[in-house]
């Protein structure tokens, strides 16, 4: 459990929360599944849990329904070490639920139940905790939070308050079912990118954001859009990170995949860890890649996030992972 008294936050995330209902049978469609596990979910929430597991203070600006699943989310956040001070309760909308199917190694269909909308998309600019946003060491926003009003305006308010401070992160986290079109998503992301310092996404998300799926071209395009650090996740092909001065590419960690859905959020939490600890870019991306790989070997997302000893053990188990470093200027 976490105390209600705290210093300024290390990591403050904003956006999606819900309950993940994942099958306990693999290789079986939902119509034939007979048992499920229930877990805290939502990408920004998972990132906060990942950061908390790595000994950082973390909180989420979000909202849940006034229902059993909402109470579960808040209780589970506290159990996992994440402050729930900024979790609102919406009495009109239910807490979202997400189902998935598990077909390893690379097919994990998702089914989101967030209609007509979700409480986390009803956050308004007045709900933004300005002091927390201003003072957090890392502010982590998600593209999904830009898909509807008033959440879009709330995210813009957070960025206005933040003032492009160091470690203002946009997770490209593109889910097509939440948007009218990819063009609408691109328009929203294009308006926000100049106000963040870090952008992270996979190749498909980069194509939506900047029109490039080639990792190097995507990274350059993100830098040209105004970020200072671009991270392109390539799944089984590794991870690329680039600043104006440096390019780092880390080969993938060899694993047997169970469920890849939480890998990106674990990577994000470890990216936060490296930034907060002042690690080199190569060290940070190596750890982020290893963290993502470790969670991909597990069923769930939030409760699968590694502790620092688990992360270091994973890295020690694979000491020969290729790391390419290049100084660009």
Residue ranges: model-predicted function:
Residues 138-221, 237-239:
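Conserved beta-alpha-beta core of the PfkB/ribokinase-like small-molecule kinase fold
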Residues 51, 202, 264:
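Short, conserved phosphate/pyrophosphate- and ester-handling motifs at nucleotide-, phospho-/glycolipid
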Residues 49, 97-101, 238-241:
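Short beta-strand scaffold segments in enzyme catalytic cores
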Residues 1-12, 160-161, 211-329:
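Conserved phosphate-binding/catalytic region of the ribokinase-like
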Residues 1-83, 256-258, 322-329:
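Glycine-rich phosphate/adenosyl-contacting loop at the front of the ribokinase-like
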Residues 15-17, 172, 266:
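Active-site metal-binding loops of divalent metal-dependent hydrolases
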